[in-house]
Amino acid sequence: PVITTASDAVGISALDQLGWPIEGDVAGVGRAMLDGEPIGFLSEGIWPIPALPENVEVDNFGASNQLLVTDRLVDFQEGVAVLRPPSLVVGVGASRGVSADEVLELIDSLLADAQLSIYSVRHLATIDVKADEVGLIEAAKRRGWALHTYPASALAEVSVPNPSERVRAEVGTASVAEAAAIFAGGSLLVGKRKSNRDVSMATGAIARHQPRGRLAIIGLGPGARDLLTPRAKEELRRAAVIVGLDQYVEQIEDLLRPGTRLLATGLGNEEERARSAIVEAKKGYAVALIGSGDAGVYGMASPALEDFDGTFDVVGVPGITAATAAASLLGAPMGHDHCSISLSDLHTPWPIIEQRVKAAAVGDFVVSFYNPRSKGRAWQLDSALVLLAEHRPATTPVGLVRAASRSSESVTLTTLTELITTGTAAVDMFTLVVVGNSSSKFVDGQMVTPRGYDWKS
């Protein structure tokens, strides 16, 4: 059976589905959110959390229900729920043979004394020579934390309040716990402390990881909803801000959480959209930059990452490309070496495009032409086809696929000579042109390129 919850019915995810641990009056605040009651929202820093509905109001301290985002311990009262951000890094130094119990007792003590939540621990950090320390590995495993290790040369460059010359002599850095916490996290909250044992074998320190924005660059595929990947859907739901071409934003708007901020612009302006996404990610928000097909293929990934400075996290979400969608409709035209070439000279001068077409022709590649023809650019496709015809048979199969996977989808099969002769007036920017190689042929209405250059008998 399919079980539908109240949150599913109104399109608002339950609080425990926001991606982070949550404590307190989760049920009460969750009901208030669904009922549209005012909820105050207070976050220590801008964290990349998904969008929240409009009744969740920033700094509305008078509301009877409150949603907090903090790594600090708080008194849980009725009407207060607390999201735990992954903000804390625990640096650990250890002697050979330390037990997991000793490590965890130390960590729990450090957190409790500093009034910090165990649920906000992002990972453990230590020096790389301790990467095989069983006690550290087991401690991290028990709590579900990652164990990150760093070389002594990196830790030695970190300024710490409690350096030790004895430690420097042993491992090449004057600090392990504090230096690893600071190197991995940011600002030191809790200085180095030893475990409370007769013979102490562990030291620990805690740093707070500064909030970082998150940019998901998402390929929406060729257009059909069933060709949008599950990962893309998850990332769209995770975003608080969506940036994209207006028609693409409209295409996926029903998948978004209520309260998602939409930054939609018209055709063109790719660089402006990329800049907008980066600005929002640098502020600390969870941002999704969307485009058709795969974002890394003639898509938004390139302008977004061209000047990436490492100040926010980036996630790439692959999508089904126009070429692969077209190929599935044509048969198996890309069964051997193939390439894609854009015929738009908006960003690439025609002489360079022409050079690439000639190379593909000489190399006998199957060629997919993107952006083949527009109202203001009508001759490039014809020229490219003539160049290919100089190096492959007149009967070479050609497939024209327009609006693959959409309601206006159409597929036309022809040959290289026939297309050159009859003209390309029917081709537009929504069409992908696939030209076979010298061994491609039609097989009962399917365009096929064999894996080898000789057909099997």
Residues covered by each model-derived region:
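Conserved mixed alpha/beta catalytic, RNA-binding, or beta-rich assembly cores of soluble enzyme
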Residues: 1-24, 34-130, 207-208, 245, ...
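Class I S-adenosyl-L-methionine
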Residues: 120, 137-138, 143-178, 182, ...
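C-terminal edge-of-domain segments
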Residues: 66-75, 82-83, 178-211, 426-440, ...
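Class I SAM-dependent methyltransferase SAM-binding "motif I" and its flanking Rossmann-like core
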Residues: 4-7, 224, 296-366
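Short glycine-rich anion-binding loops that position phosphate/pyrophosphate groups of nucleotides
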Residues: 7, 72-75, 95-96, 193-198, ...
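N-terminal glycine-rich phosphate/adenylate-binding segment common to multiple enzyme folds
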Residues: 1-60, 163-212, 286-308
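A contiguous loop/helix-start segment that scaffolds small-molecule binding in enzyme catalytic cores
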Residues: 28-31, 35-38, 43-75, 162-165, ...
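Flexible, glycine/charged-enriched surface loops at secondary-structure junctions
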Residues: 113-123, 150, 394-401
